[in-house]
């Protein structure tokens, strides 16, 4: 269990009775690839420009399934989710059918990238299907082809001193072809400013990216991002709630890399704090789809491999012209 997960897990179980949180099934001999998506009951509630539409609980291999830290929408109505144990989940949109998802490693040899398999972020070119994966510990970006075969890996110098355990938590290919990587850790303890790197094009090809400072709402940390048109991105935010029992708060903010303030800092604009409007969990993946009936956001949660948490997938209607939270 990596340090960040251990800290979160410890906080979450401290108020629970002993014996209620460990996964009990023994590990299977081989990884179980099939993943089931089961609808859950939801209430149609709105926060800012977002309205919860549907939700599903995902379940699979009793020991290895979980830990999702990133989500992207692939061409052809499919999704790709990545885990911080270096595995992937491919699945069809559950609102278009009930086919099971397929869970497995990014490479057939699970020892690949053993020293730093902590995948925390994904980005995709919707035209070609090429995917980029951001890895903590290594502070690197790996490019995968449309068949999801890993290829070139780069170690950007501007990310070299990012925290090994709170590094490239967000990576997004902006609508204009640029890439934005955001460090999870703030520059100062309990601060709101985060280092980021802006690539003019494919990060594997761009050897001279630009350093950026992003100011996010206080108390929240960035955990994923998705394109929102031109130089804008929606950033998924998480905050640990130290109540009894402890849990997580989820919010979404918007950043525009082309609109820095007078100090050169890109200030995020809060769009929504969800509170109890969505099922409460540790949401770490965010993707967007443009559909015939409008725009939708998709959130996936990280269960931290704890039996009292779930892997949830939520679908939210996004109406960009609706007023954001002031």
Spans of features found by a protein language model:
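Sequence/structural signature of beta-propeller domains
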Residues: 2-326
């Amino acid at each position: 269990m990596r340090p960040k997960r251990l800290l979160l897990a410890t906080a979450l179980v401290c108020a629970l009775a002993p014996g209620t949180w460990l996964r009990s099934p023994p590990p299977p001999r081989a990884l179980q690839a099939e993943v089931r998506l089961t609808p859950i009951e939801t209430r149609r509630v709105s926060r800012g420009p977002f309205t919860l539409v549907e939700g599903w609980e995902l379940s699979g291999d009793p020991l290895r399934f979980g830990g999702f830290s990133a989500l992207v929408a692939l061409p052809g109505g499919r999704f790709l989710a990545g885990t911080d144990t270096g595995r992937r989940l491919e699945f069809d949109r559950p609102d278009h059918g009930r086919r099971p998802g397929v869970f497995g490693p990014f490479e057939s040899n699970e020892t690949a990238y053993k020293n730093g398999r902590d995948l925390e972020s994904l980005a995709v070119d919707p035209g070609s299907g090429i995917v980029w994966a951001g890895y903590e510990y290594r502070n690197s970006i790996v490019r995968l082809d449309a068949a999801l075969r890993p290829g070139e890996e780069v170690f950007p110098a501007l990310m070299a001193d990012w925290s090994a355990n709170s590094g490239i938590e967000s990576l997004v290919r902006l609508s204009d072809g640029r890439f934005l990587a955001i460090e999870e850790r703030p520059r100062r303890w309990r601060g709101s400013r985060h280092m980021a790197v802006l690539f003019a094009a494919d990060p594997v090809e761009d050897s001279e990216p630009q350093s950026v400072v992003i100011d996010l709402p206080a108390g929240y940390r960035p955990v994923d991002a998705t394109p929102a048109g031109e130089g804008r991105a929606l950033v998924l935010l998480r905050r640990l709630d130290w109540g009894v029992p402890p849990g997580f708060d989820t919010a979404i903010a918007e950043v525009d890399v082309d609109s820095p303030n007078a100090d050169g800092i890109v200030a995020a604009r809060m769009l929504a704090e969800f509170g109890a409007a969505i099922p409460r969990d540790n949401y770490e993946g965010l993707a967007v789809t443009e559909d015939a009936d409008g725009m939708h956001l998709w959130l996936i949660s990280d269960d931290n491999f704890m039996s009292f948490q779930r892997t949830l997938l939520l679908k939210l209607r996004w109406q960009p012209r609706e007023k954001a939270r002031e």
